Amino acid sequence: MRKISSFISLLLICLAFTSCVDYVQSVTFKNGKYHMYYKVTLSKLLFAMMDEDPEEIFRGFDEEALGEVPENASVSPVNTDLEVGAEFKFGIDPKTTDETEKAFLPTIAGSKCYIPFILGENESIADSVGTDTDNDYGEAFAEAIMSSAKCRILISKGVIPSIETAYFEGKGNQNYSIPVFDYGDDNCLEIPFIVLSQKGMYRTDRVVVIRK
């Protein structure tokens, strides 16, 4: 799972300069299996402004480059008029004994459910905010951009019917509260990208969801 998060974090470094990034992660449960979906895309407008070829990032990208992902994972390019990126899909039996697959599964303990958040695993993300700024104004500007960009986690109500609260665990019980929105068949968790730069304060490799 470390390899896939490294790939995604490479793309999201662009957030140091623009908020033209979209990250979506979802989990559903159908026919006795968890179905996982991940998508990360960049705006083609960004590359047009930089006079760069957006498809160059994804050229030669395939499942082998991902490393630790389930063998049944499918990887598809995303290439529309507005964005370019990749999406990943795979199903996992909740009774699997495969360690790679188990790393992606939600874990339920009483009223708590732990949702793996692969984007929060990579250490380089913490270095992508404010590290290249030479003054307080530059750092504040970078943080403002990061705060406007959000990662979304969609959790099917077939997995968790109702959510009371969601958060990242913090030191000294100072947790980071994550907003939850009702999307009909799903609950949506919106995570500002800026919080991923605060790894010393929060455990960001998983989201704690409290069920009602």
What are these regions (language model features)?
Residues 1-5:
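Positively charged n-region of N-terminal signal peptides that target proteins for export
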Residues 16-19:
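C-terminal motif of bacterial Sec signal peptides marking the signal peptidase cleavage site
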Residues 21-23:
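Bacterial signal peptide processing site
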Residues 25-27, 32, 153:
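Buried hydrophobic packing residues in well-ordered domains
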Residues 29-45:
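Post-signal peptide N-terminal segment of mature Sec-exported envelope proteins
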Residues 42-68:
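Post-signal-peptide N-terminal segment of Sec-exported extracytoplasmic proteins
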Residues 72-212:
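Mature, soluble, non-transmembrane domains
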